[in-house]
Amino acid sequence: MDITELLAFGVKNKASDLHLSAGLPPMIRVHGDVRRINLPAMEHKDVHSMVYDIMNDGQRKIYEETLECDFSFEIPNLARFRVNAFNQHRGAGAVFRTIPSKVLTLEELNCPKIFKDISEFPRGIVLCTGPTGSGKSTTLAAMVNHVNENDYGHNLTVEDPIEFVHESKKCLINQREVGPHTLSFSNALRSALREDPDVVLVGEMRDLETIRLALTAAETGHLVFGTLHTSSAAKTVDRIVDVFPAAEKEMVRSMLSESLRAVISQTLLKTKDGTGRIAAHEIMIGTPAIRNLIRENKVAQMYSAIQTGQNVGMQTLDQNLLDLVRRNLVSSNEARNEAANKDAFPG
């Protein structure tokens, strides 16, 4: 099998990832589990040539100099793939993350109705958080798509690499990739403030400078979507504040309390019928009560504020997990693995 055939096999079998690793057969991750493809082990030269052949000259140079490289790759009429090429103790390795060619809608993802309202905020910062592979990019792409279908504005994305490709519908869409189109997230965000955007998507808020610029963009009247790898709203607020030096923390809390509109923390669970995965969400909305807790550094009280805020669309992860179990979509065991209060989910 060549790389196109392997990727087509993965897409056909609903794989989220294809793993190539010298010394082992190709493997795919399906519904969270890594499975071997019934093929012989691959040699270093096989993996190396498969990956090397789909890189451009710039990517090859990075790969040769740093021994690893991130890039995106598209097979027309099949899908786009986010690729990480690396080296390991048996030789070359690579992981291809499948990015569906179609941007799914919020309805197709079965997102709560509040996600549409969040997408329609005129300004502020909206964060989608969770571990790697929890569907953050998919959720944010659906939210950007909702804006694109309902607004006449300018949506600007900064990604590393570009994942979902958006067509301009009602909105003007400009997508920039770190590397080919800009040297860094912070450079692109600095420029974004002069590019007349209504919505700015920041693929990853990795460092102090990027977080500072995202907060500034939100404060100056833009709607900013961003991602972090935190597992809850409270941890998200702490993570942002902790990035800044002690002398700035109080000011950042004040900025965050004014500009944070929502935090969606999500995780993916196997469905009870074994046919796929479903997202569970903690949803925090920046109500006056939440803003006060952020400003006064009472983040520990945030969980109970979310718990009692269902009338405005808030929910804890455990509340959502209980609902998924009640609706027979997820097993109690599967929900318990992700729950904060495991006693609420009997074996």
Annotated model-derived regions:
Residues 1-347:
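Short, flexible helix-loop junctions that flank or precede catalytic/ligand sites
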